[in-house]
Swiss-Prot record:
Protein name, UniProt field: Putative biopolymer transport protein ExbB-like 2
Gene Ontology biological process terms, A to Z: protein import; transmembrane transport
Cysteine pairings via disulfide bonds: none
UniProtKB keywords: Cell inner membrane, Cell membrane, Membrane, Protein transport, Transmembrane, Transmembrane helix, Transport
Species: Helicobacter pylori (strain J99 / ATCC 700824) (Campylobacter pylori J99)
Origin: domain of life: Bacteria
Length: 150
């Protein structure tokens, strides 16, 4: 059961962090190569910009709960060991509680960067939509030339 907490919960959290990093790299590459003048419809641009961002937000908001699940399982294991042992082994109790807290820590370690990445990507997409607005509804001709290269 300890392996389920260690490899199952923590392994799943590591997998989720890899997904967040992969999406962040893909989105940053997409944003860097995007030309706002390629889109004639703002709605299509917004759809393209927000692709996969919901997944990043979902991972960021749920990773602490997954870590908490690992903590609850680790504490349950500790109580099971206490109940089945004839004597009290403080070292075993502390080891099991440390394992339980490790799951919570991993959940936070995944969640905090995921939320930061999500916020940065949403802000960058808002900037690109604003550049699209400036390009398609210019107030002066100079702004049209500047933002057509974005």
């Amino acid at each position: 059961m300890k392996e389920m907490v260690d490899y199952g919960i923590i392994g799943f959290l590591i997998f989720l962090s890899v997904i967040v990093i992969a999406i962040a790299i893909e989105r940053l590459w997409f944003f860097a190569t995007l030309r706002v003048d390629d889109y004639t419809d703002r709605r299509k641009l917004e759809l393209a910009l927000h692709k996969r961002l919901t997944l990043v937000a979902t991972i960021g908001s749920n990773a602490p709960y997954i870590g908490l699940l690992g903590t609850v399982m680790g504490i349950m294991l500790t109580f099971m060991d206490l109940g089945s042992a004839s004597g009290i082994d403080t070292k075993a109790i502390m080891t099991n509680l440390a394992l339980a807290l490790k799951a919570t820590g991993m959940g936070l370690l995944v969640a905090i960067p995921a939320i930061v990445i999500y916020n940065l990507l949403v802000r960058k997409s808002e900037i690109l939509v604003t550049k699209w607005d400036i390009f398609h509804h210019p107030v002066d001709t100079q702004s049209h030339e500047v933002y057509s290269k974005a």
